[in-house]
Structure formats: structure tokens, C-alpha cells
């Protein structure tokens, strides 16, 4: 495949949210991130741009491949020390309303604007075996280059669903059979390690570090106990605590149920 002026224009446009929306594509850069994409969703790959070094590191690359010099690759790379490989992929479509989630509970992100946190949460969620991640408007683009790099491409193995706000998210969750919403709070709420129904057909909402979770009438509040009396954890840290508390419960269940 040859690198044309049109292809170069597309590569540059995908650094912006507008460009991704207009084209329906995104960038996936780095050996591990593109490797996850190639393994999980090879049908999404439109083409790959790589240096000789990057192509050798990847081995088998699906679809069309364009080999470029290190200097030319640097024009498209968003990293200082690139690994010499990036793929252009179609943004996966969101699951339809006729495709209900299969997870025992749902993790939702409310107005989470930091791509590093968003990507880390995708990666952590993927490690637990869960498949759904919901988020509200005001959150970062899950397919921005920073979010994809932070996640190492994990979002391509997940079902991501976006909503206008928490209320519309709650309504759809209830239709799917997840009636209870837990809002995470750094200061008040039930202890997450003692909340027996926390992962029982529920929605656990993580908010932005600066603003927290939006208000939602009728939702329960749950907190991570912090004996050190620190202000708060960042969103990715908090999500990790909740996700691996879920893992702890399913791997060492109590005789009477999920809570041990």
C-alpha cells in the first residue's frame, strides 16, 4: 500500500475528535495496543502504517500495510519514543437495545474527562472478565489516541455504550434488568467492602475526580473507606478497588452468597 496525500490527511485528522466522528475511524498506536486490536477485532482494521522496525516487532499484520521511514512515521505518531506501528481502525458500533448486557453488574463513568484514567479503567475492566462499560456525555472520547494507548487497546474487546446523562443511563439499565444504582462518594455512603448488594444486578458509577458523580434521585451512595483520611482517590484507582472487590467476591464466595 502506498502512502497517498489523502491517507496522510486522514491520519492527521484522526488526532481530533471531529476527525474521528467524520471518518468513523480512530488510531491505535503501539505494539501492545495494535496487537490487542489485531487479536480481538481484526475486522475493524482498515490499514496499518509501520516502519521496518515496527513491522518486524508485530509479525503478522492483517489487511493492508504501508511501510514508511522513521522520519515520516514521526509525523503521525503522538508519542516521543514511538514503537513504529499504528493502525487505522473503524470505531466499533455501540450495541443495540436488542443486545442486553451479560455482566452481573455494570460499571459506568460519569463525565470522566481524563483519557489516561478512562483508558486505565478499560484495561482494568478487561482484566476482570467483564465486558460492558457505560459512560455519560462529557466523558473523554474512548477512541482518542491517549485513551487507546492507556488502555493498550482494551476498548476494542469491550462493549461501550454512551448516554446523555445519568438519568437516561439509569433508565436503560433498568430496562435491561439492572434497577439499582450506586454512586461512588469519597466522603459518605455504605462501605464498599460490606455492601452486600453492590454487584447484584446493579450499576456502579464512578465520577470525575474534580467534580464527582452527578446527583441522581433515589440512588444509593457507596464509599471506599480511607483510614488515612485522604481527600480522594483518582477515578482509575477507585474503579480498580471496586472491580477487584468484585473479583474477590466471585473467587472466594461466602456459603450464603457473593459476599464473604
Specify the residue positions occupied by each region the protein language model found:
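Glycine/small-residue-rich loop that forms an oxyanion/phosphate-binding "nest" at active or ligand-binding sites
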Residues: 62-90
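Structured adenosyl-cofactor binding patch, chiefly the S-adenosyl-L-methionine
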Residues: 87, 126-128, 142-155, 215-260
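RNA substrate-binding interface of SAM-dependent RNA methyltransferases
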Residues: 93, 97-187
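Boundary-proximal intrinsically disordered activation/regulatory segments immediately upstream
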Residues: 1-55, 139-141
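Short pre-catalytic strand/loop immediately N-terminal to key active-site residues, enriched for Gly-Thr
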Residues: 24, 109-113, 223-231
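Active-site/ligand-binding-proximal alpha/beta "capping" segment
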Residues: 182-230
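Active-site regions of enzymes building and remodeling cell-envelope glycoconjugates
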Residues: 60-71, 104, 198-202, 218-224
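Amphipathic alpha-helical repeat scaffolds
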Residues: 30, 113-120, 233-238
Amino acid at each position: 500500500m502506498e502512502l497517498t496525500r489523502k491517507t496522510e490527511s486522514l491520519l492527521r485528522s484522526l488526532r481530533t475528535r471531529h476527525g474521528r466522528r467524520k471518518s468513523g475511524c480512530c488510531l491505535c498506536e503501539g505494539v501492545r495496543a495494535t496487537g490487542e486490536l489485531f487479536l480481538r477485532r481484526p475486522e475493524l482494521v482498515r490499514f496499518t502504517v509501520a516502519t521496518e522496525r515496527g513491522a518486524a516487532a508485530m509479525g503478522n499484520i492483517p489487511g493492508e500495510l504501508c511501510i514508511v521511514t522513521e522520519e515520516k512515521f514521526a509525523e503521525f505518531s503522538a508519542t516521543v519514543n514511538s514503537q513504529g506501528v499504528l493502525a487505522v481502525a473503524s470505531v466499533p458500533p455501540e450495541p443495540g437495545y436488542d443486545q442486553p448486557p451479560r455482566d452481573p453488574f455494570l460499571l459506568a463513568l460519569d463525565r470522566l474527562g481524563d483519557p489516561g484514567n478512562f483508558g486505565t479503567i478499560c484495561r482494568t475492566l478487561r482484566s476482570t472478565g467483564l465486558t460492558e462499560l457505560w459512560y455519560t456525555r462529557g466523558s473523554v472520547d474512548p477512541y482518542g489516541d491517549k485513551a487507546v494507548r492507556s488502555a493498550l487497546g482494551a476498548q476494542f474487546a469491550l462493549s461501550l455504550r454512551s448516554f446523555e446523562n445519568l438519568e437516561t443511563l439509569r433508565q436503560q439499565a433498568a430496562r435491561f434488568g439492572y434497577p439499582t444504582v450506586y454512586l461512588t462518594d469519597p466522603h459518605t455512603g455504605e462501605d464498599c467492602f460490606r455492601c452486600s448488594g453492590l454487584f447484584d444486578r446493579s450499576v456502579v458509577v464512578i465520577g470525575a475526580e474534580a467534580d464527582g458523580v452527578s446527583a441522581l434521585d433515589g440512588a444509593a451512595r457507596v464509599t471506599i473507606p480511607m483510614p488515612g483520611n485522604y481527600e480522594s482517590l483518582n477515578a482509575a484507582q477507585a474503579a480498580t478497588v471496586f472491580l477487584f472487590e468484585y473479583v474477590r467476591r466471585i473467587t472466594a464466595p461466602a456459603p450464603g452468597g457473593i459476599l464473604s
